[in-house]
Amino acid sequence: MKGIRWSVIILLILIFAVTALPKKLVYGYVTPGPDTWYRKDVEGFLYAAELAGVEVVVLNSDYDVEKEISNIKTLVDMGVDGMCIFSFNPNGPFIAAREAAKAGIPLVVTDNVGQVLEAEDPVVAAIDFDWDAMGRDIAQYIANQWPEENIAFIAGRLEHVPVQVFLKAFEEEVKKLGKNKIVAIRDGKYIPDEAVKQVQDLIESGYDFTVLHIFNEEMAAAVVRWLKSRNLLNNPIKITSQNGAPYGIELIKEGSIKYSISSSPGWEGFISFLALHGYVTDKIKKERQWILLPITPVTKETINDKTKVVPWDVDPVWIDLTKKYFPQYMGLLDVLK
């Protein structure tokens, strides 16, 4: 009888010990599609989550509005402790903000250029690069390097808010500088073959341009190959691009892409996690934060410097850069001490 009593006591102690353990946090991430930029953003988020011991549920919307709404509601129904959304359309973040607020789930929004901060429902933070500054920087470079030459522009997805902000700034700066003219704007949809198709159509339709800006280097790499095959690359068509992707860096080194801007989606995902985690763990209580990651031109002087041309893939330099640019996150992870 005494043995049974002790067994019951031990069992109760074990049950209490298990229930007293801190609950493992679970975050949700809604990603817009399968493209490299989005995958790297997710990888950065997951890397930080692994360091923090947080579980993450990732749901892909595959550029489908209804699927995106379903993904948001799925995470809400799961009762996740926090949520991040990277949307391909302007309405997605506002829907996520509304649904998350109703459920009391903290929300971080990636690459919405801060628009969601104006929503009635509060969000923790909007994480962005300065797309306006990027557009103006590219316009200034083209004006300085190739005055009087016409420009064709291959966008990512024209419904994507960062594309719209970049393009508006680019058009305004080109007009302000008065040295170049934009003769065509086409939607490459972030699909390399589609970008090639659009460039081919522009050339065969007789558009007069010698400068081609392509919204990411994945599309630019495909266009480079196509132009090379027709002896048109730098003869006379010059390419500028953006993002500082690994394959883009190599094309810049060989002169196939003349200019680009570094913006690492991997590090962006890492910072998105820290913004969410800081709020969920009560380290940072502020809401409606607009957090901008730094951008830098990719030049011969910066191309081999990871602190300037920030890697897309998981890299220890993210830790150093976070300590430098975002000291508010010190102590959130063991590596940030």
Model regions: which residues?
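Hydrophobic alpha-helical segments within soluble ligand-binding/sensing domains
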Residues: 68, 125-151, 194-196, 243-248, ...
